[in-house]
């Protein structure tokens, strides 16, 4: 829901700096990378590098040049620390200690755990809620969209490339749009299916235009951030308005808690500090903190779907 929006805010802010940060602008860093590439990334030296590179590193797409950048990043960080200076960023990111092929280990693991939580709750939902429940198809579709987004988040934090970055951004946008569609179906779509269908078509059109513009014309981080934040805030406000209108329902407090928790946890994204132990930064902490929120939201969807099923069955009996 709105938590994905906060994540996009951080990503957009970091990406805006990606063209040049203090660390990668340092002559010592640039000279180090240049010398490393000349020494290791051509001819026989390159063959030697490839022969000793672990298979998981090559499968993840780590090149000789990438390895040079990684090693020179730590050389530069060491010099900064020796001089008593603050740790610099490189290409818009803090320096992270690589583990195996994982570029940002904590965020990658946290993204995987978020996806695992979504998968477990999807299985529980499908076991507990009959397919005849009015919200069943929409909730199941939302779960699959979320799983796909967390998969690409895991991939992106494992290996940051242009492709994985775009897939992470686009899939996050898809989750936000599907969440607001889920809200539309729950609030007005069950009574007015045609309205929900029209809204779905509009959202698909918006997503297509959004992805096409960013992919084919210009990858504008500021526009991407503004668009997703606007939709995310509308989504949160819509859910809260529905909760206020239906506060008599015993399970509504779960939805309120989810929206408020996500808004509160989003403040973690405003923290910006070098990774603790070169692994754990504010973004990773935010990812970790959202795991129980997914469990709570799917618990709400399960309770609400069973409530709607019971209500629809009662109407059939009355008819």
Swiss-Prot record:
UniProt-annotated location(s): Golgi apparatus membrane
Lumenal compartment spans: 24-101, 157-169, 222-224, 279-281
Any Gene Ontology biological process: GPI anchor metabolic process
Listed EC numbers: 3.1.1.-
Membrane topology: Multi-pass membrane protein
Keyword flag Iron: no
Chief subcellular location: Golgi
Record-level Gene Ontology MF annotations: hydrolase activity, acting on ester bonds
Residues annotated as transmembrane: 102-122, 136-156, 170-190, 201-221, 225-245, 258-278, 282-302
Signal peptide extent: 1-23
Pfam family, one: Per1
UniProt protein name: GPI-specific phospholipase A2-like PGAP3
């Amino acid at each position: 829901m709105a938590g994905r929006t906060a994540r996009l805010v951080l990503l957009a802010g970091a990406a805006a700096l990606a063209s040049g940060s203090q660390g990668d602008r340092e002559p010592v860093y640039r000279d180090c990378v240049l010398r490393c590439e000349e020494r290791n990334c051509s001819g026989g030296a390159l063959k030697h590098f490839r022969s000793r590179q672990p298979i998981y590193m090559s499968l993840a797409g780590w090149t000789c040049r990438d390895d040079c950048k990684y090693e020179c990043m730590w050389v530069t960080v060491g010099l900064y620390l020796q001089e008593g200076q603050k740790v610099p960023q490189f290409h818009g990111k803090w320096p992270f200690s690589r583990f195996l092929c994982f570029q940002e280990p904590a965020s990658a693991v946290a993204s995987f755990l978020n996806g695992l939580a979504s998968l477990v709750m999807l299985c529980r939902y499908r076991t507990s809620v009959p397919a005849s429940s009015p919200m069943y198809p929409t909730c199941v579709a939302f779960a699959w969209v979320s799983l796909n987004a967390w998969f690409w988040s895991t991939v992106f934090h494992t290996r940051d490339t242009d492709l994985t970055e775009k897939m992470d951004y686009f899939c996050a946008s898809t989750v936000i749009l599907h969440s607001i569609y889920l809200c539309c179906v729950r609030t007005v779509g069950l009574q007015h299916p045609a309205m929900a269908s029209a809204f779905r078509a509009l959202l698909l059109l918006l997503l297509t235009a959004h992805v096409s513009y960013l992919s084919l014309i210009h990858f504008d981080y500021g526009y991407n951030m503004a668009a997703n934040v606007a939709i995310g805030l509308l989504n949160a406000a819509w859910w809260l308005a529905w909760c206020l209108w239906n506060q008599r329902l015993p399970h509504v407090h779960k939805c309120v808690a989810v929206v408020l928790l996500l808004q509160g946890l989003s403040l973690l994204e405003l923290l910006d500090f070098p990774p603790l132990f070169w692994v754990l930064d504010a973004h990773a902490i935010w990812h970790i903190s959202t795991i129980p929120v997914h469990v709570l939201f799917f618990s709400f969807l399960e309770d609400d779907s069973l409530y709607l099923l019971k209500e629809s069955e009662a109407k059939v009996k009355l008819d």
